[in-house]
Each structure stands twice: as structure tokens, then as C-alpha cells.
């Protein structure tokens, strides 16, 4: 399941640099985090849904790569992002 248009717009407004910013690393990580959180709830009901689990692992991998890139290039923005999203306890 994908996010609704309203949910995506809210994430874009919160994490984007401008109103049409969909490609920055922060926005991509925030969207992936929202999708991952949504799928985690799905797997509590549908334990044997292995096809969707593969998609979840792909999203986690993509998010990890984007976070590594952001940490390497813009460490301050990386720290702010993980604090906002509640990652890396």
C-alpha cells in the first residue's frame, strides 16, 4: 500500500526545501520511513506475506543508502533528519 496524497504532501511540506522538492535526500528518506512504518503494521496482521516483506527490505536498504550518503555529504542535515524521524535511538 502506498501513502495517500495528503500524507505525501504533509511530508513534503515538513521535510522539503521548497514546496515542489521531491528529490532531496531528506524527503526521500522521510517518505520511505512513512512507508516502512505503514508496512510494519501490515506485517503484524499478515505474518506470511513474504512478497511484501521483500519490498520492505528493499525500502530499508534504499533508506540506509540515502542516509549514508547524507551523513557523508551533509552531516548537520543528517543529524537533524534522524532526530526529526526518531531513527537511531
Swiss-Prot record:
Keyword NADP: no
Residues spanning the signal sequence: none
GO cellular component terms, A-Z: cytosolic small ribosomal subunit
Xref: PROSITE patterns: RIBOSOMAL_S15 (PS00362)
Alphabetical list of SUPFAM superfamilies matching this protein: S15/NS1 RNA-binding domain (SSF47060)
Transmembrane residue ranges: none
Record-level GO BP terms: translation
Gene Ontology molecular function: any one: rRNA binding
Keywords for the protein's UniProt record, in alphabetical order: Ribonucleoprotein, Ribosomal protein, RNA-binding, rRNA-binding
Entry annotated with the keyword Cell membrane: no
Coiled-coil parts of chain: none
Protein origin, superkingdom: Bacteria
HAMAP family in the record: Ribosomal_uS15_B
Family, per entry: Belongs to the universal ribosomal protein uS15 family.
Subunit structure and binding partners: Part of the 30S ribosomal subunit. Forms a bridge to the 50S subunit in the 70S ribosome, contacting the 23S rRNA.
Function: One of the primary rRNA binding proteins, it binds directly to 16S rRNA where it helps nucleate assembly of the platform of the 30S subunit by binding and bridging several RNA helices of the 16S rRNA. Forms an intersubunit bridge (bridge B4) with the 23S rRNA of the 50S subunit in the ribosome.
Protein name: Small ribosomal subunit protein uS15
Organism: Shewanella piezotolerans (strain WP3 / JCM 13877)
Gene: rpsO
Amino acid at each position: 500500500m502506498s501513502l495517500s496524497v495528503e500524507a505525501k504532501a504533509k511530508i513534503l511540506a515538513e521535510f522539503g526545501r521548497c514546496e515542489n522538492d521531491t528529490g532531496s535526500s531528506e524527503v526521500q528518506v522521510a517518505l520511505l520511513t512513512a512507508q516502512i512504518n505503514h508496512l510494519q503494521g501490515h506485517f503484524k496482521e499478515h505474518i506470511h506475506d513474504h512478497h511484501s516483506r521483500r519490498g520492505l527490505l528493499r525500502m530499508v536498504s534504499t533508506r540506509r543508502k540515502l542516509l549514508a550518503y547524507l551523513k557523508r555529504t551533509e552531516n548537520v542535515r543528517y543529524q537533524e533528519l534522524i532526530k526529526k524521524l526518531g531513527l537511531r535511538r
